[in-house]
Amino acid sequence: MARHAIFSALCVLGLVAAALPQFATAATASDDELMSRIRNSDFFDGQAPVDSLRPTNAGVDSKGTDDHLTTSMDKASVESQLPRREPLETEPDEQEEVHFRKRGVRSDAEVTDDNIYEEHTDRKVVPRKSEGKRSFKDLLKKLALPAVGMGASYFAADRLVPELTEEQQRGDEPLTTGQNVGTVLGFAALAAAAAFLGMGLTRTYRHFSPRKNRSRQPALEQEVPESGEDGEDARQ
């Protein structure tokens, strides 16, 4: 404790000794020298302080009334007295909404339901219930040719292939020329029936598989932010 007290006393004495020359100079100096030192110091940032003790005639007209007060104040103090503009408080959930409208189209408020439906009057709307029937009819039309061709080829092969006797089946008796030609035509008809069957399966698969949209989509119209300016200003 004694060491701390001695250290504190020495610090206080050092501060007093350092401040004594300043007090002595201030006591011996005149008023003019004191004011000049204060003006030259950096305390007022190069601005002259207000001398309330000395009367001045600045700002006094011939009638003896003060026209305006001539006081030099610090810039920081002047700014502190000015009214501050507080920023507008906005809720965090509120976001700025930007409305877009197509070029050449009126605003959303002016567009009515009649205008919307007028654009689609030329289109033929098919109910959902008839879509299945139409799809089934299309499938039947696609499978008509393969079905007829396969049936005709099968019956032709059945008629063209000759009936062999027991000796011909065992190989004891050779086939005649007509039987050989009929056998060849019969196998050709069977091949045609198989081809028609493959055609029908292919058309069925293509009918139920997802189709690729090969038609080109129309170019999207450029969206322009809705504002009070004209369309030409928006293009620029």
From Swiss-Prot:
Glycosylation sites: N213
Sorted UniProt keywords: Cytoplasm, Cytoplasmic vesicle, Glycoprotein, Host cytoplasm, Membrane, Secreted, Signal, Transmembrane, Transmembrane helix
Any one cellular-component term (Gene Ontology): membrane
Traits of the deletion mutant: Gene knockout has no significant effects on parasite growth rates in cell culture. Reduced parasite growth in nutrient-depleted media with increased vacuolization and loss of organelles. Increased frequency of parasitophorous vacuoles loaded with mouse immunity-related GTPases (IRGs). Reduced levels of mouse IRGA6/IIGP1 phosphorylation following Toxoplasma gondii infection. Reduced virulence in mice. Significantly reduced virulence in mice in double knockout with ROP18.
Membrane protein topology class: Single-pass membrane protein
Segments for region (Required for dimerization, interactions with liposomes and liposome tubulation): 147-236
Subcellular location: Secreted; Parasitophorous vacuole lumen; Parasitophorous vacuole membrane; Cytoplasm
Residues that span the membrane, as ranges: 181-201
Signal peptide start and end residues: 1-26
Main localization of the protein described in the UniProt heading: secreted
Keyword Secreted among UniProt keywords: yes
Superkingdom of the source species: Eukaryota
Misc. comment: Mice immunized against the protein produce specific antibodies, show predominant Th1-type immune profile in response to vaccination and survive longer after Toxoplasma challenge.
Function: Binds lipid bilayers, sequesters host endocytic organelles in the parasitophorous vacuole space, and causes their deformation and remodeling. Plays a role in nutrient acquisition from the host. In complex with ROP18, targets immunity-related GTPases (IRGs) to prevent IRG-mediated parasite killing by mouse cells. Important component within a kinase complex, contributing to phosphorylation of mouse IRGA6/IIGP1, an immunity-related GTPase that protects mice from infection by certain intracellular pathogens, by Toxoplasma gondii ROP5 and ROP18.
Protein family membership: Belongs to the Gra7 family.
Name of this protein: Dense granule protein 7
Organism encoding this protein: Toxoplasma gondii
